[in-house]
Curated annotation (Swiss-Prot):
It is a multi-pass membrane protein. This is Short transient receptor potential channel 5. Zn(2+) binds at residues 172, 176, 178, 181. Forms a receptor-activated non-selective calcium permeant cation channel. Mediates calcium-dependent phosphatidylserine externalization and apoptosis in neurons via its association with PLSCR1. Acts on distinct neuronal populations in the hypothalamus to regulate innate behaviors including feeding, anxiety (flight/fight/fear), socialization and maternal care. Residues 1-325, 361-363, 420-433, 498-512, 625-974 are cytoplasmic. Glycans are attached at residue 461. The chain crosses the membrane at residues 364-384, 405-419, 434-454, 477-497, 513-535, 604-624.
């Protein structure tokens, strides 16, 4: 390893060490820039403002500098939610860059408002984008503010951006092959996929859908379905797209949760999209929205309790309190209606609008009648299989029996019902239901059976022993197909289990297991074909004839199995039945003494059994267990969705009569047929004006009804959205709890409040100078208290340099002594003192006042020290804690006993580069002088004449208490 760093390892003194260094070093910040960013971090408004002002004059600070984390001052202010410093930085034209995106990600609403209202000043020089490190940006180029806000799902920020009329790129179709999609995918496929994912992630935001969509429920339906289909195409991001699809489904369900009355629920579920092609625009109150939800597989929406409550009310219409009745009463009621279904059907045929005719149209009654009709059909199939009517078994073309004649109307009724369903719903919707495919297979088998029986009846008239019939005799094939159709007819009854809460989940689990079996069969057939081909190739040469076998029997069905692998078909059968243990091992033996061939054959046969039984069969069991567990975890939702589909099939108009009564033409059917024939072949001579008026009237009525329905729907949606947003914000605040961000905000608030208090006490901010006492009165009070000290203060002056351009303040130490104040002075001295600068006595009073506030009131024997630049009271023995222990004790005592005369202070540059070693230098630059209460003496010197007037009385009181018994000593260093 050391050879990677040194060429000559043997002669290296550090050959047993690996040297480390920073290979990707970044530009280090200067002390001023570090102090500037530190002030922004702590919320020190005054220091930040001073640094910005100095940067405009001296260019000693890069206001767009970044810390090691890549955060500029503006981003730090956004992270700390310090809007005052943000506004200050924006007023000084800092580089904004991705600040808006950063504020959106941090969900700082105030910062977003401030940045949206920010306008770059005209004529100002802005930092060009190319000068910034674009590769270090945390956001990809395709991310826009509205997309990022939608990703965070912050309702307030999304609302602010939508009010600015922002836009989102419209995603192309899933399998779009346009020039733009093809070229984008070829240039950078990762960026193309990521960009599509970011767009859909933004579009799937519940807050964005609630704000910008006229029909948020329908938008969630379509978007969820599109995302589900997209997950099948974009396999790399399948989990992300499925999560977004589930998010859309939950949003639609949560929106429906906010419905508070049956009226609102009916308006939502009966609303129809005018642009929808799959629904008839002439029908109203047909649960159109619920049909769309079923079409898009919105299981959560359909299984929502409010929706199920309305469906149950419609389903049990005419049977109030049905669920509260005893199960015996329910059973007797259903059996009674079931036995009466022929009479109810005949009553409907004769008079559809009578009481009995309207009674059978109720969904629950219709369901019972159809179930009773199907059970009757199964009973007749049972009678047909038992051969109650005896016939000659050796007749090649037997005529139909009485039971078969009774079965025929039911078969025709089933076929007619399937034709009507395919005509009403369309072929695509018809084949999407697996039960329809099963019905199609069952009806096809019945038709084939009837056709073959007719052929046998016409072609074969004689009687012949059945053992002598050929293998493909029509009667034999018809009997086989009829047996298969009987099995399918009996299994079709499982679909009715969905109506029961106990059998429904089991029926759904069975359907999922069938899918697992199909997946398993695909792999199993591949293994079966592979071993069948190998074994057939090995044993093909050892095939024997039937006459050479016992009892002239050849194959695995013989008493002694033989020739199990002689042909490919026989090999496939043998391997299949071996899974169930029905094949013996001696089938791998051959009559010749070819032991190697027998060994290879037995090994291949054993390997097949290990793979099929141990591996594949256990894999199938695991898959079926997983499918059952998946249904069991969501049993309630899956069952309610399946039950709703069953109920909806009986809510629709049509299909009222069960088989076989549905094939009987009703008077209503004759009326409809007559009207169609009359309008088609015998049109009446009607003036064009009358026809146009009729069309205009009907169009106006439909349009008015549509407008009224849409207005009611929009009112309900508006209320639902308001309730949803309120609940979302309330839940987010409840679930959030105390996080690390809350403690950071609290820390920042405390820090900002601290500096605000310091500014208030130190009067560092210009806007807060609202004082009442005049400077003349303050000077008079000061001269009165100072006594003869004021005369000495006239000859002394101190200069402060505000613009320290280097890291250390250059200039000699300004240390002076000031005796204790004596008695009151005369009027002339007061007048002369009022003409002087007010800052000297005021600063002296403030120094004493701050020391009093800080709790550093020293005992008479101690000698306290005060540094105005730091505002921290320090004892002389504390110098060792701040790395000045090397100072001599005598110099330290001299420094502690020295005083400064602050009667006259002038603004200007401190001339001279010599620096004193007697007193420690407390600050290295103007940015580092804001560490405590009086953080910046330069800020104090910038104050106007009225700054210190409000502190006059408090300072006088402290001066009297302080002056009794000890000498005032103040030490300052700049």
């Amino acid at each position: 390893m050391a050879q990677l760093y040194y060429k000559k390892v043997n002669y290296s003194p550090y050959r047993d060490r690996i040297p480390l260094q920073i290979v990707r070093a970044e530009t280090e910040l200067s002390a001023e820039e570090k102090a500037f960013l530190n002030a922004v971090e702590k919320g020190d408004y005054a220091t930040v403002k001073q640094a910005l002002q100095e940067a405009e004059i001296y260019y000693n600070v890069n206001i767009n500098c970044m810390d090691p984390l890549g955060r500029s001052a503006l981003l730090i202010a956004i992270e700390n939610e310090n809007l005052e410093i943000m506004e200050l930085l924006l007023n000084h034209s800092v580089y904004v860059g991705d600040a808006l995106l950063y504020a959106i990600r941090k969900e700082v609403v105030g910062a977003v408002e401030l940045l949206l209202s920010y306008r770059k000043p005209s004529g100002e020089k802005q930092v060009p984008t190319l000068m910034m490190d674009t590769q270090f940006s945390e956001f990809t180029p395709d991310i826009t503010p509205i997309m990022l806000a939608a990703h965070t799902n912050n309702y307030e920020i999304i609302k602010l951006l939508v009010q600015k009329r922002v836009t989102i790129p419209r995603p192309h179709q899933i399998r779009c092959n346009c020039v733009e999609c093809v070229s984008s995918s070829e240039v950078d496929s990762l960026r193309h996929s990521r960009s599509r994912l970011n767009i859909y992630k933004a579009l799937a935001s519940p807050s964005l859908i609630a704000l910008s969509s006229e029909d948020p429920i329908l938008t969630a339906f379509r978007l969820g379905w599109e995302l589900k289909e997209l997950s099948k195409v974009e396999n790399e991001f399948k989990a992300e797209y499925e999560e977004l699809s589930q998010q859309c489904k939950l949003f639609a369900k949560d929106l429906l949760d906010q419905a508070r009355s049956s009226r609102e629920l009916e308006i939502i579920l009966n609303h129809r999209d005018d642009h929808s092609e799959e629904l008839d625009p002439q029908k109203y109150h047909d649960l159109a929205k619920l049909k769309v939800a079923i079409k898009y597989h919105q299981k959560e929406f359909v299984a929502q309790p409010n929706c199920q409550q309305l469906l149950a009310t419609l389903w049990y219409d005419g049977f109030p309190g049905w669920r509260r009745k005893h199960w015996v009463v329910k059973l007797l009621t259903c059996m009674t209606i079931g036995f009466l279904f022929p009479m109810l059907s005949i009553a409907y045929l004769i008079s559809p609008r009578s009481n009995l005719g309207l009674f059978i149209k109720k969904p629950f009654i219709k369901f019972i009648c159809h179930t009773a009709s199907y059970l009757t059909f199964l009973f007749m199939l049972l009678l047909a299989s038992q051969h109650i009517v005896r016939t000659d078994l050796h007749v090649q073309g037997p005529p139909p029996t009485v039971v078969e004649w009774m079965i025929l109307p039911w078969v025709l009724g089933f076929i007619w019902g399937e034709i009507k369903e395919m005509w009403d719903g369309g072929f695509t919707e018809y084949i999407h239901d697996w039960w329809n495919l099963m019905d199609f297979a069952m009806n096809s088998l019945y038709l084939a059976t009837i056709s073959l029986k007719i052929v046998a009846y016409v072609k074969y008239n004689g009687s012949r022993p059945r053992e002598e019939w050929e293998m493909w005799h029509p009667t034999l094939i018809a009997e086989a197909l009829f047996a298969i159709s009987n099995i399918l007819s009996s299994l079709r009854l499982i679909s009715l289990f969905t109506a029961n809460s106990h059998l429904g989940p089991l029926q759904i689990s069975l359907g999922r297991m069938l899918l697992d079996i199909l997946k398993f069969l695909f792999i199993y057939c591949l293994v079966l074909l592979a071993f069948a081909n190998g074994l057939n190739q090995l044993y093909f040469y050892y095939e024997t004839r039937a006459i050479d076998e016992p009892n002239n029997c050849k194959g695995i069905r013989c008493e002694k199995q033989n020739n199990a692998f002689s042909t490919l078909f026989e090999t496939l059968q043998s391997l299949f039945w071996s899974v169930f243990g029905l094949l013996n091992l001696y089938v791998t033996n051959v009559k010749a003494r070819h032991e190697f061939t027998e060994f290879v054959g037995a090994t291949m046969f054993g390997t097949y059994n290990v793979i099929s039984l141990v591996v594949l069969l256990n894999m199938l069991i695991a898959m079926m267990n997983n499918s059952y567990q998946l249904i069991a975890d969501h049993a309630d939702i899956e069952w309610k969705f399946a039950r709703t589909k069953l109920w909806m099939s009986y809510f629709d108009e049509g299909g009222t009569l069960p088989p076989p009564f549905n094939i009987i033409p009703s008077p209503k059917s004759f009326l409809y047929l007559g009207n169609w024939f009359n309008n088609t072949f015998c049109p009446k001579r009607d003036p064009d004006g009358r026809r146009r008026r009729h069309n205009l009237r009907s169009f106006t009525e439909r349009h008015a009804d549509s407008l009224i329905q849409n207005q009611h729907y929009q009112e309900v949606i508006r209320n639902l959205v308001k309730r949803y947003v309120a609940a979302m914000i309330r839940n987010s605040k409840t679930n959030e709890g105390l996080t690390e961000e809350n403690f950071k905000e609290l820390k920042q608030d405390i820090s900002s409040f601290r500096y605000e208090v310091l500014d208030l006490l130190g009067n560092r901010k210009q806007p807060r100078r609202s004082l009442s006492t005049s400077s003349t009165e303050l000077s008079q009070r000061d001269d009165t208290n100072d006594g003869s000290g004021g005369a000495r203060a006239k000859s002394k002056s101190v200069s402060f340099n505000l613009g320290c351009k280097k890291k250390a303040c250059h200039g000699p130490p300004l240390i002076r002594t000031m005796p204790r104040a004596s008695g009151a002075q005369g009027k002339s001295k007061a007048e002369s003192s009022s003409k002087r600068s007010f800052m000297g006595p005021s600063l002296k009073k403030l120094g004493l006042l701050f020391s009093k506030f800080n709790g550093h009131m020293s005992e008479p024997s101690s000698e306290p020290m005060y540094t105005i630049s730091d505002g921290i009271v320090q004892q002389h023995y504390m110098w060792q804690d701040i790395r000045y222990s090397q100072m001599e004790k005598g110099k330290a005592e001299a420094c502690s006993q020295s005083e400064i005369n602050l009667s006259e202070v002038e603004l200007g540059e401190v001339r001279g580069a010599a620096q004193s070693s007697e007193c420690p230098l407390t600050c290295s630059s103007s940015l580092h002088c804001a560490s405590s209460i009086c953080s910046s003496n330069s800020k104090l010197l910038d104050s106007s004449e009225d700054v210190f007037e409000t502190w006059g009385e408090a300072c006088d009181l402290l001066m009297h208490k302080w002056g009794d018994g000890q000498e005032e000593q103040v030490t300052t260093r700049l």
